[in-house]
Amino acid sequence: MDRETEAETAELVTESLVEEVSIDGMCGVY
């Protein structure tokens, strides 16, 4: 894998984690 691919993968993983945390946070609030 080249660096660009690794960077894109890292971004996708980060976005997925952020979405999961946001959903968990909203569920926790309500």
UniProtKB/Swiss-Prot annotation:
InterPro entries: MftA. Changing residue 30 to F: Loss of MftA decarboxylation by MftC. Transmembrane segments: none annotated. The post-translational modifications that lead to mycofactocin involve oxidative decarboxylation of the C-terminal tyrosine residue catalyzed by MftC, introduction of a tyramine-valine cross-link, removal of the modified C-terminal dipeptide by MftE. The released dipeptide then undergoes oxidative deamination by MftD, glycosylation by MftF and methylation by an unknown enzyme. The record marks 28-29 as: Cleavage. Pfam families: MftA. Mycofactocin is classified as a ribosomally synthesized and post-translationally modified peptide (RiPP). Interacts with MftB. Precursor peptide that leads to mycofactocin (MFT) after extensive post-translational modifications by enzymes encoded by adjacent genes. Mycofactocin acts as a redox cofactor of nicotinamide-dependent oxidoreductases encoded in the same locus. Belongs to the mycofactocin precursor peptide family. This is Mycofactocin precursor peptide. The gene is mftA.
